[in-house]
Every structure is written in structure tokens, then in C-alpha cells.
Amino acid sequence: MNKTAIALLALLASSASLAATPWQKITQPVPGSAQSIGSFSNGCIVGADTLPIQSEHYQVMRTDQRRYFGHPDLVMFIQRLSSQVSNLGMGTVLIGDMGMPAGGRFNGGHASHQTGLDVDIFLQLPKTRWTSAQLLRPQALDLVSRDGKHVVSTLWKPEIFSLIKLAAQDKDVTRIFVNPAIKQQLCLDAGTDRDWLRKVRPWFQHRAHMHVRLRCPADSLECEDQPLPPPGDGCGAELQSWFAPPKPGTTKPEKKTPSPLPPSCQALLDEHVI
């Protein structure tokens, strides 16, 4: 499937999530041992943790949206990464969307983030902590040129390279989605230490943030992991294909009906949503 068709499918998936979703009616985590259920784009979570809003190492954006819930492994990853960044004097980590209290489908903006194992992190590390007003209405820093072929050299910083590398080297991380131009710059800057690049995957948009995804926890027996990324650093023909013009004759795919929820997620909705 060519990139244009993939883009249209991604847009349709995101558009489908614009419809009202019952998951928003669940305002607190569902009690129980932490269990990520289903797939990243069709699932839910029991026993989610709340990311502490107050931290000396990170700040949480758009707290009014209440998207700061996730599996305990995700909360620990954020705390681990932000502590590393702070210890290196790189700045404050800016945390975007995680998931809703019980996971599930958003009403817009995301097709995934449903099992408590995804988090968006801004690709900027302010040295001065943001004000409450800045956090509620964050200004994203677009690192990619208008033509989408490279990063903006005046905005690309070694600290951003290090932030992505630190996240990719974490044992629990399986994928990090960034814009193809950002992946390309990482490939140029990486030197001989390149194993971590395998986890960094080019994807549409993602011009100002990285989307980090963790592996399914071992004790979440109903969690569906993705296959591992292809071997290698992903800096060759696959990456370059993202910069090729779309093939003529690309047709818009038919709108897909959302897949049925995993039975455990449907049961959760039936119990907790009137």
C-alpha cells in the first residue's frame, strides 16, 4: 500500500474517533489489577494509574482534558525518562496525551492511545518551567520544513536527539513515531551507535512531538502486541520512500467500520456506562 493510501486510512481512523465515545463517561480508573486489554487502536485498560501532575522533572499539558492515565509501566517510564533528562541538565520534559481513565477510543485526535501504553511527548525541553496558562494552551514547535523534506536547522537541537535516543533505549519501549524528516535527521546524527534507531518509526504529522509506545506488560494476557519493527536502523530505502511523490491514480479507501471491541472491554463498558 502506498503512503497516500496509508495517510487516508489513518485520517479515516482518526475521523471515526470524532464521534461521541462512551469511554469519556468513565471519569475514574476501573478498580483492579492493571491490565491492558486489546490492541493499541481497539482496547481498554483496567487498573490504570494516574500520572502525578506535580513533578520537578516533567510538566503535564492540557490537564483539563484529563488524558493523563495509563498502565503503571507507562507512568514509571515517564518518571524514568524525565529523571534521566533532568539529571543530564537537558530541561523539563513536556507530557502530552496518555489515555483516558479506562482507555478506549478518544472522540478526536487519536486512533490509538487506548490501552494505557502510549504517550505523546513534545520535542522541546524548556529550561524555564512553563506557566499554567502555557500548559493549558501549549504552543507546539514545528521542527519540520514546509516541504517536509528536512528539519529546520535553527530549531533542531542536540538535546532533542538525546531525548528521542534515551526514550528508544528504554527496555519497555517498542516504537517511537516521529515525522520522516525527524527520523532522517536522527539517522544523520546517530554515528555508529545505531541499534536504537530500529524503534524510531516514520509516520505522518508528528512534526513537534514523539509518540512513544510500550510493549504489552507480561501479565496483561489479553493485550495484543504489534510485530517488532523490521531489522536494521530503518534509514535506507524504507525511509526514503516517505519522501517520494504519491503514485498517480491513488484512490480514496472506503470508510471502515470500527472493529468490535474485545469482549472484556465491551463488558467493562456495559458495567460502568449507563
Swiss-Prot record:
Record GO terms (molecular function): metal ion binding; metalloendopeptidase activity; serine-type endopeptidase activity
Keyword Disulfide bond in record: yes
Record bears the keyword Disulfide bond: yes
GO CC field: outer membrane-bounded periplasmic space
Disulphide connectivity of cysteines: C44-C265, C187-C235, C216-C223
UniProt xrefs under Gene3D superfamilies: 3.30.1380.10
Residues binding Zn(2+) 1, per UniProt: H110, H113, D120, H211
Reported cofactor(s): Zn(2+)
Textual note on the cofactor: Binds 2 Zn(2+) ions per subunit. Zn(2+) ion 1 is bound in the active site. Zn(2+) ion 2 is bound at the dimer interface by residues from both subunits.
Pfam families hit by this protein: Peptidase_M74
Keyword line: Disulfide bond, Hydrolase, Metal-binding, Metalloprotease, Periplasm, Protease, Signal, Zinc
Residues covered by region (Disordered): 228-264
EC number from the UniProt entry: 3.4.24.-
InterPro entries: Hedgehog_sig/DD-Pept_Zn-bd_sf, Peptidase_M74
NCBIfam families: PRK09429.1
Name of the molecule in the record: Penicillin-insensitive murein endopeptidase
Taxonomic source organism: Escherichia coli (strain 55989 / EAEC)
